Amino acid sequence: MAMAAMDARKKKSGGGGGEPLLGKYELGRMLGRGTFAKVYLARAVAGGEAVAVKVIDKAEVMGTAGMAPRVLREVAAMRRLRHPHVLRLHEVLATRARIYLVMELATGGDLLSRLAALPRRRLPESAARRVFVQLVDALSYCHARGVAHRDVKPQNVLLDGDGNLKVSDFGLAALPDTLRDDGRLHTACGTPAYAAPEVLRRRAYDGAKADAWSCGVILFVLLAGHLPFDDSNIADMCRKAHRREYELPRWVSQPARRLVSRLLDPNPDTRVAVESLAAHHPWFKRSLSVDSQLDGLLNGEPERAVAFQAAPPPPLNAFDIISMSPGLDLSGLFGEHDKSLREKRFTTTASPEKTLEQLGLAGGKLGYVVVVGKKGVECLPLAGGRLSSGIAAMSVEMSEVAPPLLLVELRLEVAAGDVDGGDGEVKGFGWEQLRMELGDVVRAWHSCEDLCEI
């Protein structure tokens, strides 16, 4: 229907009337407009893909202080970002009079409009969680690539036809070359209701931590249906933010309350970073179904498997990676002897199958083997050599954060005497080599020392 309407209602939008824009895109109806730009529904001449085209008037931009750098920032930021929850910039076109940003089409509108259409202007906590974890995933990706959004608000969060989130409008984004010598940003920008207190007070600030505050405001809005602080008076709003004078409705769960509190921390030094939420906060965790995710791996029992006499494996969201060498006495290690547990965590967007496969390949060099059978986890001894430490097992637990993001937890069990006293690392186990072997499968490592409850 949209494409038929486009054909019937081609408009003159700066793209040459009824002629395809630079021979590449047929412009249709207007989707929205701002001070200096209009956004049109369009269709690619080659292939027929539906896209959105943002048409920017050069004369108006050049005649307004600060607008030309903003357009350049938006293009520079979007060109370096390729993520399922970040609106994609396909290409940039230009004529003498106009600039055209050809972007991914988000047919679901913006988050603010979606909330406004609801009777109570809020989401159930489960639905709010789904939206919010996608937002956190997108911003974590941006921050890892040196991009701080600086204008995170529901109007700039779009939705596709399936309700998946797309962060948009990077016109105020800060790139690494925006930082001063002190490594901070100094330009106050954004929307006051969603801006961090340090930004409103025009102090030097960390762009990623400012985005974290904005995420806290959005989470509050998703759960409560209104802003945490009245924005009719900015000075009063800033005072209330510093005093944490907000109140969540009684139906909001305690884990969600704690998360809002950590995000709406007026002190940016103690405010939680969005990058740490997926790995560390319990509100984000959701168990994977191993039967559905790893069905292709369960192809029968290994022919050389030896029964592993230990506590039964955890429920269907866990695997054991068994590490052993000839002569290693497993019974002593899994008896009543003192043990130390060392953990590492990382996040990945690879599939569970791919992650487990890569762990298995790494095991060939580090002296362990991954075994998943119909009866559960079993031992498969490796031939040759002796490990330099009394490693008994390393379990791997995968939890779904938000598709396709997984949290992978590695727990290494060793005899107490095989742990160095200095840094708590396990003697002889090559964590650094494991990091190298996993390579691009790992999105980010999260140290165990940071695993305090958020």
Curated annotation (Swiss-Prot):
Keyword hit for Nucleotide-binding = yes
- Family from the record: Belongs to the protein kinase superfamily. CAMK Ser/Thr protein kinase family. SNF1 subfamily.
The question of whether Manganese is a record keyword is answered with: yes
**Residue span of region Activation loop:** 169-198
Query: Which organism is the protein's source?
Result: Oryza sativa subsp. japonica
Q: What class of enzyme is it?
A: transferase
| PROSITE patterns in the record | NAF, PROTEIN_KINASE_ATP, PROTEIN_KINASE_DOM, PROTEIN_KINASE_ST
Q: Which GO terms describe its biological process?
A: signal transduction
Q: Which GO terms describe its molecular function?
A: ATP binding; protein serine kinase activity; protein serine/threonine kinase activity
Q: Which domain of life is it from?
A: Eukaryota
What cofactor is needed? Mn(2+)
Q: What is this protein called?
A: CBL-interacting protein kinase 4
Check the record and name the InterPro entries matching this protein. Answer: Kinase-like_dom_sf, NAF/FISL_domain, NAF_dom, Prot_kinase_dom, Protein_kinase_ATP_BS, Ser/Thr_kinase_AS
Alphabetically list the UniProt keywords: ATP-binding, Kinase, Manganese, Nucleotide-binding, Serine/threonine-protein kinase, Transferase
